[in-house]
Amino acid sequence: MKAGIHPAYVDTTVVCGCGNTFQTRSTKESGHITVEVCSQCHPFYTGKQKILDTGGRVARFEARYGKRAGKKADAK
């Protein structure tokens, strides 16, 4: 490796909004990173993920426009 072209790699403390902290290594010189979510509070990792129901949108679309298109096709 060439000397002098690589950034310094320092021990870093990551602090989450939920209060969880952990140690990692980073090129950020301050040695401190603040994040909003981490693996301890993110819904995907905690199992509290909300699954969106897109079927309701499709049914609503068909109720609005599907019936009109069906009437036009039947009228011909």
UniProtKB/Swiss-Prot annotation:
Highest taxon in the source lineage: Bacteria
A molecular-function term among this protein's GO annotations: metal ion binding
UniProt keyword list: Metal-binding, Ribonucleoprotein, Ribosomal protein, RNA-binding, rRNA-binding, Zinc
SUPFAM superfamilies for the chain: L28p-like (SSF143800)
Co-factor requirement: Zn(2+)
Stored Gene3D superfamilies: Ribosomal protein L31
Cofactor binding remark: Binds 1 zinc ion per subunit.
GO cellular component: ribonucleoprotein complex; ribosome
Binding site for Zn(2+): 16, 18, 38, 41
Keyword Ubl conjugation: no
Family the entry assigns: Belongs to the bacterial ribosomal protein bL31 family. Type A subfamily.
PANTHER family with a match to the protein in the record: 50S RIBOSOMAL PROTEIN L31, CHLOROPLASTIC, LARGE RIBOSOMAL SUBUNIT PROTEIN BL31C
Protein's job: Binds the 23S rRNA.
The protein, known as: Large ribosomal subunit protein bL31
Species name: Nocardia farcinica (strain IFM 10152)
Gene responsible for this protein: rpmE
